[in-house]
Amino acid sequence: MQNDIKIKERAYEFAIKIIKLTKKLPKDTGGFVLGRQLIKSGTSIGANVEEATGAFSKDDFIFKMNIALKEARETNYWLRLIRDAGMLKNPEVEDILNESKNIKNILSAIVKTSKERR
């Protein structure tokens, strides 16, 4: 349960960082398209974690957390693409990319533990 609260707060703070980061992307087609994808996946993590906390059953909880995990993986992909394409300075992206990896690891652990306790 403590992990659930921790991930809920981290995912919310992460979404705010994602929103702020996308404002710094280039104002061109690439920046717009990748920014939109990043906003969608990066803010969806917390939304799905929030839904999971109100799940009707253990299976529903696992399902929602799995969706959050998939969104975290997608977010990680977009961040790597932005970094490797040189759209933003490396240190700026690296910090949020590390947080993305941490969130992904926490979600993986929650899903694994929840499945084992099913």
List PLM regions with ranges.
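Short, C-terminally biased terminal segments at protein or domain edges
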Residues: 1-118
